[in-house]
């Protein structure tokens, strides 16, 4: 039998870990996933009810329900022909030469399902957060990340073989000739991309990916395509700069995107179109289309038709469904209570920053200014993004609706370039069990769905709530001061606001945090301290600040606080899924998240009488304190 002094995670969650079962259609079960399952059940019933009693007074929700009904009309889906998919494939098949491809770039972006072998995006400018910038990156890889392509990776061959076989079967369904050769050619192009692709560690340090290049310099370096004309077609003007997020890809552009590789690029585009179409037709094709993803994570069976129907609707109407969910399930009492906790947590942070022992007063004061400028959003947004008023279902097929929606969404992406950034917009729907900090707007967002037990409940004690949602709130605040967020000022701009000596001291703290987790063994392999450092800084800051706030309450119970902390990180997952997370997820494995941060807190040792001989013991000189 385990003891808290040896393993907080395993002891607190012992009964749950023994009894919890991973759903057959998921790679894991966790405190988060349990709420997701509850929400799915509620929303499926809600949308089915709305299907019978159409919300004619809510035009956006009405369109979502129409699409939901179409997604669930399996009689029509089973009979639907593939002419629209074949039409999309033909848009690429008829590009016989690289010259044809060059002459059709704009058409492919705005009026086809074919992805280009490079990507332009419109994001808030990291150095001018009120305006948008044009970003440039590579096209993404077939395997989860670059580490999977190492020859010593145990799953490399089986995953690539499975993808090729699965993709050729999909292509054959759409009557594509030479399906096996096309799948093999796509893999050849994918392999060419690997050396120039960012690693997961590089993506994790997103503040370091901001590489602005004047548009003239950017387009002149690329000889094989007329990117100047494409950019003008995309954003209807000539920006003064392009932000390159994947340097190696940009440097390698002409050696990858050229006449010699055209047949490989063409094959790669065809596979993307075909795979992307599998969700919109008959049941056999839907099952076939999801097979690779299930094999990757060792998921036992496909999502049910009902869940798929909800998933597909959410993929286009997420904020619409979120707003409906928030208004139905999130009460004013809970909103007021969570707002009170956010205010309390910010006050705790103010006090901790003012007493910080390793920052100069000047930097601490600027940190407090940034803290005071953080805007919290709780529950659900006040309004929907305007784009939803444009999404209208038609009399055509489910796939044809999706094509139209994708065109509208793509056009909207580039249309935003000439507008100011709306810092009140939400990037997560209210029914998503999650929370986030946005560095470019300096906002923290807590959707309604996470504001449920075990994270939060009006029925739980204050210590339980601080051990749950309190740590999540403080975690998101801490992201303003993690290795990425700390580089953004109170306005959301990438801007050096620290004194040099303070930032150097912070970098030393980061190294200590990396060392604390790096190489720690889990059942799926060792943790990568560099990949997960930002989230670990936020976890440590979160539990530290929430603990301080919990102690200020009259009914403080630190055993309940630490137990609740361990409960929110409970998780069981397939080994394959855990291995994938180790390679690419910026969060630490669940058990390490639960067990390591408390060992840096004196109160943990006092509460559970942890001794030097216990496994959870960390010597005082090795206990890390950042915020």
UniProtKB/Swiss-Prot annotation:
Enzyme Commission (EC) number: 3.4.24.-
Entries under InterPro entries matching the protein: MetalloPept_cat_dom_sf, Peptidase_M13, Peptidase_M13_C, Peptidase_M13_dom_2, Peptidase_M13_N
Cofactor: Zn(2+)
Keyword annotations from UniProtKB, A to Z: Hydrolase, Metal-binding, Metalloprotease, Protease, Zinc
Thermal response of activity: Optimum temperature is 30-38 degrees Celsius.
pH-dependence annotation: Optimum pH is 6.0-6.5.
Domain Peptidase M13: 1-627
Pfam families: Peptidase_M13, Peptidase_M13_N
Disulfide bonds: none
Active site: 476, 539 (proton donor)
Alphabetical list of CDD domains matching this protein: M13
Domain of life: Bacteria
GO molecular function, one term: metal ion binding
Primary role: Endopeptidase with broad substrate specificity for several oligopeptides.
Family: Belongs to the peptidase M13 family.
Record protein name field: Neutral endopeptidase
Species name: Lactococcus lactis subsp. lactis (strain IL1403)
């Amino acid at each position: 039998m385990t003891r808290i002094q040896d393993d907080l995670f395993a002891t607190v969650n012992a009964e749950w870990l023994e009894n919890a079962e991973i759903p057959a259609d998921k790679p894991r079960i966790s405190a988060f996933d349990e709420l997701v399952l509850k929400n799915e059940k509620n929303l499926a019933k809600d949308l089915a009810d709305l299907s019978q009693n159409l919300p004619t007074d809510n035009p956006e929700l009405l369109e979502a329900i129409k699409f939901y009904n179409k997604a669930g009309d399996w009689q029509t889906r089973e009979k639907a022909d593939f002419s629209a998919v074949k039409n999309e494939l033909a848009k690429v098949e008829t590009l016989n030469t690289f010259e044809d491809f060059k002459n059709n770039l704009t058409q492919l972006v705005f009026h086809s399902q074919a992805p280009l072998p490079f990507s332009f995006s419109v994001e808030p400018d990291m150095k001018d957060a009120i305006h948008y910038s044009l970003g440039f990156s590579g096209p993404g890889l077939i395997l989860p990340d670059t580490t999977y392509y190492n020859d010593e990776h145990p799953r490399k061959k089986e995953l690539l073989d499975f993808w090729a076989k699965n993709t050729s079967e999909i292509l054959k369904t759409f009557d594509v000739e030479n399906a096996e050769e096309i799948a093999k050619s796509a893999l050849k192009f994918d392999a060419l991309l690997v050396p120039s692709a960012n690693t997961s560690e590089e993506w994790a340090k997103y503040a370091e990916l901001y590489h602005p290049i004047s548009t003239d310099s950017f387009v002149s370096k690329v000889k094989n395509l007329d990117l100047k004309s494409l950019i003008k077609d995309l954003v209807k003007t000539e920006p003064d700069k392009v932000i390159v997020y994947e340097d190696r890809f940009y440097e390698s552009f002409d050696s990858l995107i050229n006449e010699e590789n055209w047949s490989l690029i063409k094959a790669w585009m065809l596979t993307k179109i075909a795979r992307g179409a599998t969700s919109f037709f008959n049941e056999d094709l839907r099952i076939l289309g999801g097979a690779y993803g299930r094999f990757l994570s060792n998921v036992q069976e496909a999502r049910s038709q009902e869940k798929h129907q909800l998933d597909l609707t959410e993929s286009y109407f997420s904020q619409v469904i979120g707003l409906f969910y928030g208004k139905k399930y999130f009460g004013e009492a809970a909103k007021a209570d969570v707002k009170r906790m956010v205010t309390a947590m910010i006050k705790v942070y103010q006090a901790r920053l003012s007493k910080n022992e390793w920052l100069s007063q000047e930097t601490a004061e600027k940190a407090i200014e940034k803290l005071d400028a953080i805007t919290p959003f709780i529950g659900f947004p006040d309004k929907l993004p305007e784009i939803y008023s444009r999404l209208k279902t038609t009399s055509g097929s489910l796939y044809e609706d999706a094509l139209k929606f994708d065109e509208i969404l793509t056009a909207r992406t580039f249309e935003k370039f000439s507008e100011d950034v709306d810092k009140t917009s939400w990037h997560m729907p209210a029914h998503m069990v999650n929370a986030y900090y946005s560095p470019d707007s300096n906002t923290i967002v807590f959707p309604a769905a996470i504001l449920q037990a075990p994270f939060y409940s009006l029925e739980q004690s204050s210590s339980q709530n601080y051990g749950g949602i309190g740590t999540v709130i403080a975690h998101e605040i801490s992201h303003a001061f993690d290795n990425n967020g700390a580089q953004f000022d109170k306005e959301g701009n990438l801007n050096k606001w620290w004194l040099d000596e303070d930032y150097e001291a912070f970098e030393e703290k980061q190294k200590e945090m990396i060392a604390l987790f790096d190489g720690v063994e889990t059942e799926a392999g060792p943790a990568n301290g560099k990949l997960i450092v930002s989230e670990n800084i936020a976890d440590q800051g979160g539990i530290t600040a929430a603990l301080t706030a919990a102690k200020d309450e009259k009914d403080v119970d630190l055993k309940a606080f630490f137990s609740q902390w361990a409960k929110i990180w409970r998780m069981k997952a397939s080994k394959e899924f855990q291995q994938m997370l180790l390679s690419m997820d910026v969060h630490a494995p669940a058990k390490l998240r639960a067990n390591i941060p408390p060992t840096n807190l004196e109160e943990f040792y006092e509460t559970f009488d942890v001794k030097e001989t216990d496994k959870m013991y960390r010597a005082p000189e090795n206990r890390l304190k950042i915020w």
